[in-house]
Amino acid sequence: MKIKATLERVPGGMMVIPLFLGTLINTLFPNAANTFGSFTGALLTGALPILAVFFVCMGATIDFKATPYILKKGGALWITKILIGVIVGVIGAKFLGEGMIKSGPFVGLSVLALVASMNDTNGGLYMALMGQFGKKEDVAAYSVMSLESGPFFTMVTLGVAGLSAFPWQMLVGAILPLIIGMILGNLDKELREFFGRAVPVLIPFFAFGLGAKMNLLDVWKAGLVGILVGVAVVVITGTALFIADRLTGGNGIAGLAAASTAGNAAAVPAVVASANHAYAPVAPAATAIVASSVIVTAFLVPIITAWWAKRIGVVNNNAA
């Protein structure tokens, strides 16, 4: 059975399918973690420790030595992505505060869901698209953009938006595993390769644990909102990133390729809620919305990027 290949055919499948399975188990057997305890209980409830390891491994893949082009390209896209998250967070906070919409067609929508969806780029998708329509330096620009990974900038954005702030210790704690990984990976290339191989392996495990804290009813309610948020991510961040790419000498393809939601962004609401319990009531719905945005952006971004590349006459590097 080609289970892995089947999962990979679904956009964000390594994140989304285990997330759904965890949610299904929690919906049908809500006391499973307590009933089985031991390692089974840890697998169902241990998403945060797995995420800590994930961010150490992710940090190890970030190279301090970047060429000026990589710094310029990656830095411009990274800063633009974060600024858009801040702007959306500030505007959203005026209407939603720390809570979420509890009825109507936008039920479950919160500032946390919006910011988490917009702050983090799907690195695998970006690098695959730039491998097709860009040059190797464009692919390498993700080494700078990957600094956006994790909950740190979402926490900062929520604080800037005037919502419940986080103690400095929590902010440091949110980014410390990434920094430790960066230091280790740059001190030893073999460690970088060793830890780097674990990044994709850990994704389905923390996704399953996150799903085990959710209910299918929450996912169902978040369906339409998640689709709308995904479209908003492509339109809003895509427009800003396209402009930033053009202003830094690009043709716009890199900007469009970065207008997505990372699979691991679905983990951010739970981490934020663990750091500040004011966000605990909105975290399950936010997780479902972000997961939906992962799928929607994974479908739309390649189509839009390929369309623009064709329009400006850029040849697919993978074409025969």
From Swiss-Prot:
InterPro entries for the chain: 2keto-3dGluconate_permease
Gene: kdgT
Function in brief: Catalyzes the proton-dependent uptake of 2-keto-3-deoxygluconate (KDG) into the cell.
Catalytic activity: 2-dehydro-3-deoxy-D-gluconate(in) + H(+)(in) = 2-dehydro-3-deoxy-D-gluconate(out) + H(+)(out)
Example of a GO MF term: 2-keto-3-deoxygluconate:proton symporter activity
Gene Ontology CC: plasma membrane
Keyword rRNA-binding belongs to the record: no
Official protein name in the record: 2-keto-3-deoxygluconate permease
Transmembrane annotation, as ranges: 10-30, 42-62, 76-96, 98-118, 143-163, 165-185, 199-219, 224-244, 253-273, 288-308
Topological category with respect to the lipid bilayer: Multi-pass membrane protein
Protein family: Belongs to the KdgT transporter family.
Keywords: Cell membrane, Membrane, Sugar transport, Symport, Transmembrane, Transmembrane helix, Transport
Annotated compartments: Cell membrane
Species the sequence originates in: Carboxydothermus hydrogenoformans (strain ATCC BAA-161 / DSM 6008 / Z-2901)
